[in-house]
Every structure is written in C-alpha cells, then in structure tokens.
C-alpha cells in the first residue's frame, strides 16, 4: 500500500516480482503504473489500451503522471533529448489509442540524489514537507510549454527556498545540515537548464500536429537514500577547467 493505493492482486504473484504494468486501487481512483524499462513490450501496451478503452469507452484515462528520475536529467544533452523523444513516442501511442490529448503532469522523483536538497526540509514538520513543490500550468488548447512561464515558475520556486531559508536554519542545529540548507537553492537552480531541455524537447509542437498537453512539473522524494550528485561542486570545478 502506498499513499492510500493498494496494488491489485499483487500478493497472488509474490511481492518480489517487478511487473511492467501494475494497477493501484484506492477508494476514489485507479492508477495504472507502466514501466518504461526493458521488461516493457509494445504488445503489453496495445492490450492495455484496448482493455481500458473497452472498460471506459468515453474516456479511457483522465491523464498521465510522468515520473522521471532526476538522475536521468544529469546525463549529457544527447541522452536527455533521446529520452524525451522515446517518451513522446510512447505518449502519442496512448493519445492515438484513446482519441484524446491526455493532460501530462511531470513528476521529478528521487530529488534526494541532488546534494543538499532534502536537507533543506529537514527541520520542517510533516505537513510542511507534504506540501506540493512545483507548478501547475494553465490549459493550452494546442499543448506545449511556454518558455516564459517555465522561467517564471522555476525562479519562483528558487525564491521560495530562499525566503524560507531563515526558518529552515532556525530549526536545524546540525552544522552540516545548516551548510546544506544554505546551498540548496543553488543546487536546485543548477537543475533548471537540463529540466528545460527535457521538457522543451518533450512538448515541442510539430508542423502538422499539436504538441503534447503539458500541465505541470513537480518535485518529490520517496525517502530512500541513494548516491548524491553535487551540482554546485561540479559547476565550480568545471569553471576552474576541470572536467
């Protein structure tokens, strides 16, 4: 069970098995989790689309939560654009199968792998940490993502971190954590360029068709520890001529 959702009939097969498609059920909705790994297969997606369309003929799905691990945004530009193109192709498959342009909400996950970011929130209570950190875009008839909107919203998130820095520092006595709190807005700011590269590629329009329907970007972390990337140290090192 996660966030009120329970994996449907998972125990019939064993909890240690990773499935390319999983159904998560709650009292108010159903989430379909679709792996983009090597275990996925076009025939699985085709069967899923057919089944959902038969079950809900008028509207097979309400939208897409596109989960992207932040580590994939730290790759080189070519790999980032390739990932965006592959995702775009898969999403188009769903849009064509369902006959709609599904609204897409981008969730950047595993933010704890960015140095200092999660430490910023260490002294806040649970309700504060549970607040949404991201931005929801206004509806656009022809889809796509507006560069000015993205810049304004991302800069606003950086400003929020800076504005809350005093409160974060006041609640944290550990010096290492205090150093991380001071660095967090800079670490977060250094992610902006690569995130824009990814989103702009994913949501750019084409000559004869509308762009995908972008509706927002959000940041989250599942609490699990992982290797960290220090974007600030890498930038400083690069500025001194070190690769």
Predicted regions and their residues:
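Basic, amphipathic N-terminal segments
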Residues: 1-243
